[in-house]
């Protein structure tokens, strides 16, 4: 196991995609300390900004990196990692777990935007809140998250799962607008409230909103009322309105919205062939 301690509170962004079990495994502390990073526009060694403590005895698959301290300015932690564990005891910066294929990242605090962007496997768990574009594609790209799990215990920002292609995003708190925008497949499970416009331009996939949503986009049609919905093999008690869309994009995505928490949507029931 390797433990990293920030030597100071960072003023400028630190680009440290080398902080990954794939890179650290089989390296000595001295070799790890010589890995190159960027702090602002200056190239530095990892040991310039982190104190590095090494403990032997972990296999490659169980290799763990522990980061103790505020690394909210440190970007690309866990970049393209495929195995092992990263534990951040504090806040993490942007692009956490970008493109990861396996392994587990756990953050005890908050994480900034783009966490899990373009990830293909593995698990990211954030005990606090996250920023925007979780599990999303980058601007100009149509390749979002394509596997793995992202679990957020707090709230998430705008465009959760933008261009999502597969996998699971679970948010225990609330989300901003445009959750599941351009979604291709996969599941977004929101236990709290949504600020609205969920599923805009989605083609396929499943979005579940257990809390309040102000309104449904007019390009979605109500299809049914379901007593429960299945998320990642587990049944979530409803009842839920089931909407299909986005019809403007010939989409067949499913948007499940709590009936109990959204009495303002009762008018949709007249469009069903029968009332439940």
Positions of PLM-derived features:
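Intrinsically disordered, low-complexity terminal regions
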Residues: 1-70, 76, 125-127, 140-153, ...
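Right-handed parallel beta-helix/beta-solenoid
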Residues: 117-118, 122, 139-141
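Long, hydrophobic, well-ordered secondary-structure blocks that form the structural core
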Residues: 100, 104-106, 123
């Amino acid at each position: 196991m390797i433990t990293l301690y920030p030597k100071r509170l960072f003023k400028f962004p630190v680009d440290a995609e080398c902080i990954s079990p794939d890179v650290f495994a089989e390296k000595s502390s001295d070799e790890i300390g010589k890995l190159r990073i960027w702090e602002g526009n200056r190239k530095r060694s990892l040991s310039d900004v982190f104190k590095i403590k090494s403990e032997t005895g972990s296999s490659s698959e169980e290799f763990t990196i522990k980061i103790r301290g505020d690394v909210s300015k440190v970007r690309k932690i866990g970049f393209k990692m495929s195995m092992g564990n990263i534990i951040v005891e504090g806040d993490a910066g942007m692009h956490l777990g970008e493109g990861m294929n396996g392994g587990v990242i756990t953050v005890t605090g908050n994480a900034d935007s783009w966490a899990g962007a373009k990830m293909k496997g593995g698990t990211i768990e954030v005990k606090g809140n996250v920023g925007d574009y979780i599990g999303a594609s980058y601007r100009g790209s149509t390749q979002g998250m394509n596997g793995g799990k992202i679990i957020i215990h707090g709230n998430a920002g705008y465009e959760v799962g933008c261009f999502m292609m597969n996998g699971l995003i679970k948010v225990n708190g609330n989300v901003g607008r445009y959750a599941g925008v351009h979604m291709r497949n996969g599941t977004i499970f929101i236990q709290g409230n949504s600020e609205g416009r969920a599923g805009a331009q989605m083609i396929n996939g499943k979005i579940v909103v257990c809390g309040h949503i102000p309104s449904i986009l007019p390009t979605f049609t109500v299809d049914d009322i379901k007593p429960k919905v299945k998320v990642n093999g587990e049944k979530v008690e409803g009842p839920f309105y089931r909407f299909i869309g986005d019809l403007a994009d010939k989409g067949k995505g499913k948007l499940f919205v709590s009936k109990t928490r959204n009495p303002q949507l009762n008018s949709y029931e007249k469009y069903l062939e029968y009332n439940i």
